[in-house]
A protein has these predicted regions:
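Short loop/turn segments that connect beta-strands within beta-propeller blades
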Residues: 38-41, 84-87, 135-139
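Signature of short aromatic-glycine-proline-rich micro-motifs recurring in repeat-based ectodomains
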Residues: 105-114
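A flexible loop/linker signature enriched in serine peptidases of the S9 family
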Residues: 1-4, 19-34, 48-58, 70-82, ...
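Beta-propeller fold detector
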Residues: 44-50, 89-96, 142-143
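Residue-level detector of Asp-centered blade-edge/turn motifs that repeat once per structural unit
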Residues: 11-12, 63-65, 114-116
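Hydrophobic beta-strand positions that form the internal "hydrophobic ladder"
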Residues: 13-16, 68-69, 119-120
Length: 143
């Protein structure tokens, strides 16, 4: 691959998630979230979790309990997703709203995990920025 960004270790240090993409594409056009096991300081086999040439993904993060979350534009809106134990991904914010930003600014974060299990998030809807709280089990955003 040509570009790598946003490496994040799982809370127990056993897995690493990151973004990658190829030239001539731009990261807001198509990226992938990759995950690999980590053992003795080395990466094991990497697998693609989400994204591709026509789907852009952003901000892979592990929740405190070790569940991978990321933002994807697969619905044409940057929504927040959670990878379920069976490998499927669930849209936690199925809204016509933007929970991500194009990756011309690396390191930007639009969500963070709270100690009570909820997720604090920033999103744009109808051109207005909002701060919300999200329950990752039931989904939906409260302002």
């Amino acid at each position: 691959r040509d570009f790598y960004a946003a490496p994040r270790f799982s809370p127990d240090g056993s897995r690493l998630a990151w973004l990658e993409w190829d030239m001539p594409g731009m990261p807001w056009d198509g990226t992938e979230v990759m995950v690999a096991d980590v053992a003795e300081g080395r990466l094991g086999h990497a697998r693609s979790v989400a994204g591709g040439p026509t789907e852009s993904v952003f901000q892979p993060e592990w929740s405190p309990d070790g569940v991978l979350h990321f933002v994807s534009d697969r619905t044409d809106w940057w929504n927040l997703y959670r990878e379920e134990p069976d490998g499927t991904q669930r849209n936690l914010t199925p809204l016509e709203a933007e929970f991500g930003v194009p990756l011309w600014e690396l390191g930007y974060a639009t969500y963070a995990f709270l100690s009570d299990g909820r997720i604090a998030c920033v999103y744009r809807r109808d051109g207005v920025h909002h701060l919300g709280m999200l329950d990752p089990i039931i989904g939906g955003v409260d302002r």
